[in-house]
Curated annotation (Swiss-Prot):
Domain of life: Eukaryota
Region annotation Disordered: where it falls in the sequence: 1-43
InterPro entries: Ribosomal_uS4, Ribosomal_uS4_bac-type, Ribosomal_uS4_CS, Ribosomal_uS4_N, S4_RNA-bd, S4_RNA-bd_sf
Function: One of the primary rRNA binding proteins, it binds directly to 16S rRNA where it nucleates assembly of the body of the 30S subunit. With S5 and S12 plays an important role in translational accuracy.
Record organism: Piper cenocladum
Listed Basic residues bias regions: 1-14
Protein name (database record): Small ribosomal subunit protein uS4c
S4 RNA-binding domain: residues covered: 89-150
Primary localization class, coarse: plastid
Amino acid sequence: MSRYRGPRFKKIRRLGALPGLTSKRPRSESSLRSQPRSGKRSQYRIRLEEKQKLRFHYGLTERQLIRYVRIAGKAKGSTGQVLLQLLEMRLDNILFRLGMSSTIPGARQLVNHRHVLVNGRIVDIPSYRCKPRDIISTRNEQRSKVLVQNSMDSASREELPKHLTLDSSQYKGVVNQIIDSKGVGLKINELLVVEYYSRQT
């Protein structure tokens, strides 16, 4: 299954706020799930919607998400928590959380077009897994700086998560540590996502 490129507002009306996908929001929170449903939602439907929420927020293909779930399942600790850590430490998501891009798809374009450096070297892989003490910056070129500055100017002034530090004047961010569960930028029940895939096998 390919990465979603359809109407974004349609997705947030069905699944709720997806800040990584789009900065747009419905006029009121009550409209998020106000669409009529045919009867009570099944447990399968609930797990499916939670999985879709995770996939669309982080901009993943189905195959990519399955791979992350498998990696998380082999790691020590809670599979759901490890899964969120893996997704949150992706380079495209780090750029988004720093405010250097207004959305994760926008961050992915910055990386693909070679505007982003990690520890002084160009990295053009959006899924690159960032580590503590990594320094994320833009190329020392006017176009790269303008793209990031436009995003920082338009970004909502949300508090920066504790695992990141931003020096906006230098177009530079630092990964301080691995993110903890409190710093995740999406309201999600990750256990339902793990349950969804465990029942598919």
